[in-house]
């Protein structure tokens, strides 16, 4: 397929760590598919920067969760978005790629599209789960959608939105058979004996809301299973600092906190207690029994409940189309309930075998060589623009 011979400029925005991961994968594919040099710039995180991305703003300025929590950051986010749009319209890159962060990116994408700059969005918003009215905004803003999940293109096609199913980069990255023994050696954990990975989130608000409940659940589990060990990844020194008071309050826990390495920590585990989010898909790809939980402020929870369509929030259940792992949310997420459910996941060997089959099928479906497939879709959009010019 022909491509422009002059230097390309691609603007991109990722708004949170999961988007940084996806965008870095896409950048790796683009660097192989597109001619060098191509200038990639905009807003991104550490993984994107490691791929040669030129980030003009700090990604964490856009990282918020929930309606109530976002209110204090709205002025700063609007300022950054305004500056970004002015820059795009002045410099006119060959395309704009928004990676997730739909509430931020759709506005930018519509401005780019209205100005004749192709707009590509990576990660279809979960319009099939809640806020389905966003499909109208997508149709106005997006020239081409890169979809992580196989059922999404059919939904978009009905609204006249071009799309490509590219799979999920985590499915390419994670082996079909996880090396639990090797992960335990890497973390200095005993080869034998039960291990539970606990992931309470990475944001201050998440730790404040669910951290104490998770630690109380761990204490109950330790009482019932004295030989039980826990592993908890802390992505940053700041997160470790947030967790330290909870660690100090539970000195009896056989707990190992790792510096990052969340995937290794989950691989080492026999079961996982995890806050809802992309990490639940990672746990499924690692074939681990899990309990999914979250707590958000009351108002945020009410809005989410009223705008939701599905009875589940965890990606493993959404992709399976049924409850394959338990979810304990909001006031149902008590220490007792979390401890009971997690120990059941740990002990039930028949359930473990069933989950391995379900998660392996899921893994194979999502393993699509995402970086190359997404890069090829971007190249097609760029080529279409060249032919129209």
From Swiss-Prot:
GO cellular component: membrane
Keyword presence, Cell membrane: no
Keywords: Glycosyltransferase, Lipid A biosynthesis, Lipid biosynthesis, Lipid metabolism, Transferase
UniProt catalytic activity: a lipid X + a UDP-2-N,3-O-bis[(3R)-3-hydroxyacyl]-alpha-D-glucosamine = a lipid A disaccharide + UDP + H(+)
Annotated EC: 2.4.1.182
Pathway as given in its UniProt record: Bacterial outer membrane biogenesis; LPS lipid A biosynthesis
Family note: Belongs to the LpxB family.
Protein name: Lipid-A-disaccharide synthase
Name of the encoding gene: lpxB
